[in-house]
Amino acid sequence: MDPRMWQVFPGVARMAAWVGCIRAESRLAIQALRREAAVLVYPGGIRDVFRPHHQRRQVCFFGQRGFIKLALLEHAPIVPMISHGAHDTLQVLADFYPALAGLHRWGLPWPTVIDPGAFPLYLGLPWGLALGPLPNLPLPVPLHTRVCPPITFPHYGREAAHDPNYVKDCYDQVRQTMQQELDRLYAAYE
């Protein structure tokens, strides 16, 4: 779970922890994997959750490669999950985060006390038209999720995880595989 949740919504974060969520930190993910726990990672994080609705058919990790390094270090396969409909539960019209970050660099404070990571303008419940990463109730739409076959890589270990070119190749493989599966899922349900 995004570490900002613990600062902004500590009550929600505590409830999520009761059902097994952990803070999105590599140290905690490594501990979980070494206990042979399944670890569900959202590489795109809050930017993926609040990306504009017109990007819903795209796999967006925003260059985040930590999940690849983690898998390589811990000799773990990546089991992709993709879904159709999740971005219809909230209609994000635009993300004003880049403009907000620019204003922050000029000295203006964040409107949310901390760096929000995303600042969407969206239509959703219960607010109607809302601005900012606020908690919301999902719109009632059908969701279709597919758990894809595991992806393994030819090389694992510290050396593989520290080779930027190899990490990029693994990242590209995962992203492309997930995009192909997402395209198939959209074709099946639209």
Regions found by a protein language model. Give the residues of each.
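Hydrophobic/aromatic beta-strand patches that form the interior of the parallel beta-sheet core
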Residues: M1, I22, V79-M81, T145
